[in-house]
């Protein structure tokens, strides 16, 4: 399992429905995180729990009054922030050979969707406000990164 996690002042995700209408399905504002999460075919059964802990507890925010370029002392949980979770199987793409990514290491959609749902519920159970994209949909994700401060988390 991999996640690209960015501190954001705002982030949103829109989905185009069957009629062609674009609708907003999730939106957060700072302090907040945008978490793009991909599940791997060989992920451990408890990888989602580790991911919940990492997203909730990683110290990605500066202490109150500290500049954004300074040391990071607080987690999204500690600052009372929000998380926008977007499923992103393309994070599992392999690009070592050729010009077309291979998705062979990505967890198939029917198995990956409940894993992403477990992460969302796990974060909410910790008292974190969570918004989501729409699993399997063609989404438009927008964000205003703070810093920018982005980390890759692998579980």
Curated annotation (Swiss-Prot):
Q: Which Gene3D superfamilies match?
A: D-tyrosyl-tRNA(Tyr) deacylase
What reaction does this catalyse?
A: glycyl-tRNA(Ala) + H2O = tRNA(Ala) + glycine + H(+); a D-aminoacyl-tRNA + H2O = a tRNA + a D-alpha-amino acid + H(+)
Enzyme class, top EC level, equals hydrolase
**Any one cellular component term from GO for this entry?**
cytoplasm
Please tell me where this protein is predominantly located: cytoplasm
Chain span(s) of sequence motif Gly-cisPro motif, important for rejection of L-amino acids: 147-148
Is Hydrolase tagged as a keyword? yes
Q: Which UniProt keywords apply?
A: Cytoplasm, Hydrolase, RNA-binding, tRNA-binding
- Kindly list the places in or outside the cell where this protein is found, as annotated in its UniProt entry: Cytoplasm
UniProt-listed GO biological process terms: D-amino acid catabolic process
Which Pfam families has this protein been placed in? Tyr_Deacylase (PF02580)
**Metal-binding listed as a keyword:** no
Question: Which EC number applies?
Answer: 3.1.1.96
One GO MF annotation is:
Ser(Gly)-tRNA(Ala) hydrolase activity
Q: Which InterPro entries match?
A: Daa-tRNA_deacyls_DTD, DTD-like_sf
User: What is the recorded function of this protein according to its Swiss-Prot or TrEMBL entry?
Assistant: An aminoacyl-tRNA editing enzyme that deacylates mischarged D-aminoacyl-tRNAs. Also deacylates mischarged glycyl-tRNA(Ala), protecting cells against glycine mischarging by AlaRS. Acts via tRNA-based rather than protein-based catalysis; rejects L-amino acids rather than detecting D-amino acids in the active site. By recycling D-aminoacyl-tRNA to D-amino acids and free tRNA molecules, this enzyme counteracts the toxicity associated with the formation of D-aminoacyl-tRNA entities in vivo and helps enforce protein L-homochirality.
Fill in the subunit field for this protein. Answer: Homodimer.
Family listed? Belongs to the DTD family.
Cross-referenced PANTHER family = D-AMINOACYL-TRNA DEACYLASE 1, D-TYROSYL-TRNA TYR DEACYLASE
What does the UniProt entry state concerning the protein's domains? A Gly-cisPro motif from one monomer fits into the active site of the other monomer to allow specific chiral rejection of L-amino acids.
Q: Which NCBIfam families match?
A: D-aminoacyl-tRNA deacylase
Q: What is this protein called?
A: D-aminoacyl-tRNA deacylase
In the UniProt record, the gene name given for this protein reads dtd
């Amino acid at each position: 399992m991999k996640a690209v996690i960015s501190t954001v002042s705002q982030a949103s995700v829109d989905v185009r429905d069957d009629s062609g209408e674009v609708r907003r399905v999730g939106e957060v504002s700072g302090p907040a995180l945008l978490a793009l999460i991909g599940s791997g075919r060989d992920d451990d059964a408890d990888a989602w729990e580790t991911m919940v802990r990492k997203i909730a507890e990683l110290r990605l925010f500066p202490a109150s009054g500290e500049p954004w370029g300074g040391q990071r002392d607080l987690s999204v949980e500690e600052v009372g922030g929000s998380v926008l979770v977007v499923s992103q199987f393309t994070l599992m793409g392999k690009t070592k050979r050729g010009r077309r990514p291979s998705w062979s290491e990505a967890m198939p959609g029917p198995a990956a969707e409940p894993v992403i749902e477990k992460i969302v519920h796990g974060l909410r159970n910790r008292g974190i406000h969570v918004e989501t994209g729409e699993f399997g949909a063609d989404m438009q994700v927008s964000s205003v990164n703070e810093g920018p401060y982005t980390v890759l988390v692998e579980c």
